[in-house]
């Protein structure tokens, strides 16, 4: 149900027009001739055409398969994506637990040389998680039964999670660096080059901004999975779970002057539902039995085993595919957005549109090419 239906005229449809052929060819040949005389121009052309890999900082409340885990797998399997590192945050799972899951996926998917760091175990506001269940109970959303880490005993040791879960010793040693400092250091050492994929609560990014506010302008792009802009939330009627876990962090991030921000919100996530046939196509595209085991342990596998007619949203996976190929976006709206970060507010954690010029213009995808989306997912997974 949409709280504020998006007017059709505000949806920007991406399409290719038809232009006269000979002027384009003439100009193209002329440009190629000129650029061949100047090596610097050739390098610029290579960079603009994607000749260089896109560098990505992957920040996530990682789970083993759907949805963060599969997002990590397909990013690792994309030749023109270079993941600099994985930082974890509490959301779906505790940050230490997420680190164990991420390390195992990295071992199985060619990510042994990445940096792995357990990030923020708790949200920015002290005691925020203490009241989480009470808030949701008082104002439950459609998916209020799922509450992530707060539903489980807190995990504080990634190694014990790993060995208990996988009955083996890890091959990857994580870094002890503070996640927020790592994020800031990476951005400052490669200004204008890094894309942040933030598919969990925004705590690590917000902490990096608090200590190094200059990183916003030096980041190439940030892509979030979070929020519900013009539609209902899932955990409460107003808020989506990632942003509700740490509303203060979400607000700090989307208010920051990043050159380009994209929020993959429930507005588009709710349009992509995976049925059993599609899930089996994804599962069967994987060849590695060890990786398939992670899928079998996942809730999605069990869901379709118990109810073949069920469907499931894939949230974070959409953000990852957009990072790989933003051309899957077929409709979007650009708007100035903010987050309600007032703890006593009845709409705490809600993303909303504002006309305030002090807020950033953010792209909100509304439609994607679903055939292309699933083709990208299965083609990447088929490498394993």
Enumerate the predicted regions with their spans.
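Active-site histidine-anchored catalytic micro-motif
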Residues: 50-113, 157-271, 276
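Conformational coupling and interaction surfaces
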Residues: 50-53, 72-83, 241-251, 260-384
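Bacterial N-terminal signal peptides
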Residues: 27-36
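Bacterial N-terminal signal peptides that target proteins for export
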Residues: 9-27
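Surface-exposed loop and adjacent secondary-structure segments within mature catalytic domains
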Residues: 114-173
């Amino acid at each position: 149900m949409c709280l504020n239906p998006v007017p059709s005229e505000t949806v920007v449809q991406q399409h290719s027009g038809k232009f006269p052929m000979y002027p384009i060819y003439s100009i193209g040949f002329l440009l190629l001739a000129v650029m061949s005389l100047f090596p610097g121009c050739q390098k610029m052309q290579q960079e603009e055409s994607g000749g260089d890999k896109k560098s990505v900082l992957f920040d996530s409340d990682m789970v083993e398969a759907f949805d963060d885990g599969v997002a990590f797998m397909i990013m690792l399997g994309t030749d023109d994506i270079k993941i600099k590192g994985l930082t974890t945050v509490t959301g779906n799972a505790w940050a230490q637990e997420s680190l164990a899951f991420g390390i195992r996926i990295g071992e199985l998917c060619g990510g042994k040389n990445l940096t792995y760091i357990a990030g923020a175990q708790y949200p920015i506001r002290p005691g925020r998680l203490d009241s989480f269940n009470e808030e949701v109970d008082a104002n439950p959303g459609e998916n209020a039964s799922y509450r992530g880490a707060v539903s489980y005993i807190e995990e504080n040791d990634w190694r014990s999670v790993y060995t208990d879960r996988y009955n083996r010793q890890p091959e990857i040693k994580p870094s002890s660096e503070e996640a927020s400092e790592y994020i800031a250091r990476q951005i400052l050492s490669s200004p204008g080059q890094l894309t942040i994929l933030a598919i969990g609560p925004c705590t690590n990014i917000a902490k990096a901004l608090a200590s190094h506010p200059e990183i916003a302008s030096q980041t190439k792009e940030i892509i979030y999975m979070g929020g519900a802009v013009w539609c209902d939330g899932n955990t409460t009627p107003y808020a989506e779970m990632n942003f509700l876990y740490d509303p203060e962090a979400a607000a700090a991030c989307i208010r920051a002057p990043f050159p380009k921000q994209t929020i993959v919100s429930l507005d588009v996530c709710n349009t992509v539902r995976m049925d059993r046939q599609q899930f089996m196509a994804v599962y069967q595209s994987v060849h590695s039995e060890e990786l398939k085991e992670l899928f079998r342990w996942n809730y999605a596998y069990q869901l379709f085993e118990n109810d073949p007619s069920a469907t499931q949203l894939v949230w974070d996976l959409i953000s990852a595919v957009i990072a790989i190929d933003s051309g899957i976006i077929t409709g979007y709206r650009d708007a100035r957005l903010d987050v309600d970060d007032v703890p006593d507010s009845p709409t705490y954690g809600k993303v909303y549109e504002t006309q305030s010029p002090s807020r950033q213009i953010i792209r909100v995808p509304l439609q994607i090419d679903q055939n292309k989306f699933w083709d990208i997912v299965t083609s990447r997974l088929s490498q394993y």
